[in-house]
Amino acid sequence: MQWYVRNHIIDLNIPRIMAIWNVTPDSFSSFCEPELASSTTHAERLCCEGADILDIGAESTRPGSTPVSCEEEQARLQQPLVWAKTHTQCPISLDSRHLKTILWALSMGYVDIINDVGESEEPADEREGVIYRAVRDAGAGLVLMAWNDHGGEILSFEKCVKKIVIQLEKRLQMALDNGVDKRAIVLDPGIGFGKGLDNDMRLIAHAPSALAHLGCPVLIGHSRKRCLAQTVGLPVEKLDAPTAMASAIAFMQGASIVRVHQPALSLYARQIAISCTKHAS
């Protein structure tokens, strides 16, 4: 399986690691790293430690974070995106919910992938249609996330998965109707977006099989999430090893991509998962 993303064709027969570069002061990264998380020094380390894709965001999606305007978001992103485009060979992904920021980054040629992470102020169908046409015209990759929460309702895992499938089926069909190449699309079940901590843990292992019938690769974004903290009883700054353990499980269950803060540990997880899968067959 291959992922067509603007100037790159990413071979997903080998599971891939998307590294998170948050250029924002209130993200999970901001107090967990040995250097300033928003610095190019940090980005260089991510690339050297095994990142296949660099996912850059300037607005935190963690619980309790402060929303930012698209103008502030673009101001934060400008220099990191220029640096990434000129200093790394990795495909560049934009992590954003703002329509104006997504259109700006595509029009400037800064990014290869749009990682659309959430609800914005625009009407959903209108906003997503504009994004999908812009992605189509740029030949960019697209990550479709099930970012709708479940309204505080505690659902069984089966009902949780059903809601995720319905959300992603709708977004996938809308993207295809707007001309996006299916080979450019990856699906994300939206771990940590109001689905319940127990369900989040189960999604790490079971989302790839639950979404397989949609015919797109699956990305698992579990890094430093509350579900891991609850499971192992550790604070967020101690969650990189549990994240890597979960990455190995996700890879072995069919995930094509994991999105993580520390790619080096998930690189080991990938090696173990590939070896175990090979010997199991």
Located regions from the model:
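N-terminal binding-site loop/beta-alpha segment at the start of enzyme catalytic domains
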Residues: 10, 16-39
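N-terminal carbohydrate-binding accessory modules
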Residues: 1-12
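N-terminal glycine-rich anion-binding loops that anchor highly charged ligand groups
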Residues: 11-19, 23, 45-58
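Catalytic PLP-binding core of fold-type I/II PLP enzymes
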Residues: 21, 86-96
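Phosphate/pyrophosphate-binding loops at sites that engage ATP/ADP/AMP, CoA/4′-phosphopantetheine
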Residues: 44-48, 52, 169-184
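Active-site-adjacent loop and "lid" segments of alpha/beta metabolic enzymes
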Residues: 5, 28-38, 42-45, 61-83, ...
